[in-house]
């Protein structure tokens, strides 16, 4: 939940002991990464600057995320993957916005290009998937909906942090013996518009196959639920279009 336990709240644990955050005063950290601010907002801006992503381009990406999400909702694409909670049976955050409305927002940092419009939504939610071994599949006579061909976990410089999908993709393709041309659909979390935009720039993967039903800019990514939420949406969309990977 992002409304009850805000992101970064765990970093306050040491304040009573005189530590404002886990990094300040750490000689090992400073010697390795310097004294740059550790912030997703800062990382998003660094990515936008490095890949020369203009504010207008990011706002256009954000607008398309909302359009795709609203279209998916209207067509009932999410209905199979959502378990209603009392009367709540659809995402509340996608909105009919415009480039003009987004242009009115102030940047998060003076002189920057990252605004609330190109950032993921603050939302609450939960998700889950059931992953079993081949042995359990046979033992319990289960019918699988998908098979994981390869799973990678790759880290990135913590100052940049949000660029990790780029090396993770390269590593996964290498280890699996696959090419991006083999992939039907991809979900790259839209923490900020600059994240999937930089990924698409580096991989040359088409936007038409990326976050096809909108992403976190429109739908949010509740803390602790993002991975399984994206996997669930990806699985349902692959089944809907008859895709394989």
Identify the meaning behind each predicted range.
Residues 1, 34-40, 96-121, 202-229, ...:
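Conserved catalytic cysteine-centered active-site region
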